[in-house]
């Protein structure tokens, strides 16, 4: 299972599109959010913690790592923010007047951000989803690992897991310091949580008997004899499998 965490608040969150601007750190609010999230997840065993290279994510990840001696930590640029090109560092109220803005909102699959370093939204989604798939393979089916990333990247990963076209990814929210969880299986991904800013870890822990939990999926049990995991977990209600 992958836990997708958006970084905590910064002084620029909201009014400015920070993008890859260096030196954007968590403010006091963001530090408090990161500490609160770390406390919520304290009893959840993590196989690894992986972060975007940007400071606001690394600081959030470091707060979660505090007290987790022996848990490996990594930085993966593929979980970095979208490369917004010439939009980087601009105020959102200014960008909202740009002719490209409504296209970003309604048709992001057709968007490439302006400037030599501007990235396409499909390209950003592809690198992020590929990174998740690579880490799934590297860490194994029963891993529970955390990725600290950015709003648009998290929304793009969740949209892919839900089978949504990228043009619908703006329907998904990823608030600062929120948690989204996806269990990947041989059959399909199961989106366990989205934009969770206050829930406990019930439902994220693997069941006590992981060996006998067919259908428990990545981070929660072994595959059954067919090699696939059929449900989203004990609380799921698949067709023909409960009400």
Language-model features: locations:
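Acidic, low-complexity terminal tails and accessory targeting/binding regions
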Residues: 1, 84-93, 137, 141, ...
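Generic beta-sheet signal
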Residues: 2, 143-149
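General small-molecule cofactor/ligand-binding pocket signal
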Residues: 3, 74-76, 192
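Loop-to-helix element that buttresses phosphate recognition and phosphoryl-transfer chemistry
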Residues: 3, 9-64, 114-129
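Active-site metal-binding loops of divalent metal-dependent hydrolases
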Residues: 8, 151, 196-197
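Phosphate-coordination/substrate-recognition cap region in phosphate-metabolizing enzymes
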Residues: 35-103, 241-243
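Glycine-rich phosphate-binding loop signature in dinucleotide/nucleotide-binding domains
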Residues: 42-45, 135-143
């Amino acid at each position: 299972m992958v836990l997708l965490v958006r970084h905590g608040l910064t002084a620029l969150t909201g009014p400015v599109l920070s993008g890859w601007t260096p030196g954007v750190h968590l403010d006091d609010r963001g530090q408090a959010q990161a500490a609160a999230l770390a406390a919520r997840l304290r009893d959840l065993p993590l196989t690894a913690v992986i972060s975007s290279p940007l400071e606001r994510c690394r600081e959030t990840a470091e707060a979660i790592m505090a007290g987790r001696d022996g848990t490996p930590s990594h930085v993966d640029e593929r979980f970095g923010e979208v490369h917004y090109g010439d939009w980087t560092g601009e105020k959102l109220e200014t960008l909202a007047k740009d002719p490209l803005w409504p296209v970003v909102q309604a048709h992001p699959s057709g968007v490439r951000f302006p400037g030599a370093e501007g990235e396409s939204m499909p390209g950003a989604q592809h690198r992020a989803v590929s990174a998740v798939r690579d880490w799934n393979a590297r860490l194994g089916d029963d891993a529970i690992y955390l990725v600290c990333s950015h709003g648009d990247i998290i929304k793009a990963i969740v949209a892919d897991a839900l089978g949504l076209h990228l043009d619908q990814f703006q329907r998904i929210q990823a608030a600062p310091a929120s948690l989204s969880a996806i269990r990947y299986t041989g059959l399909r991904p199961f989106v366990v949580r989205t934009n969770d800013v206050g829930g406990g870890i019930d439902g994220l822990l693997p069941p006590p008997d992981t060996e006998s939990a067919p259908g428990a999926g990545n981070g929660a049990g072994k595959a059954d004899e067919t090699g696939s995991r059929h449900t989203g977990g004990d609380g799921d209600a698949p067709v023909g499998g409960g009400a």
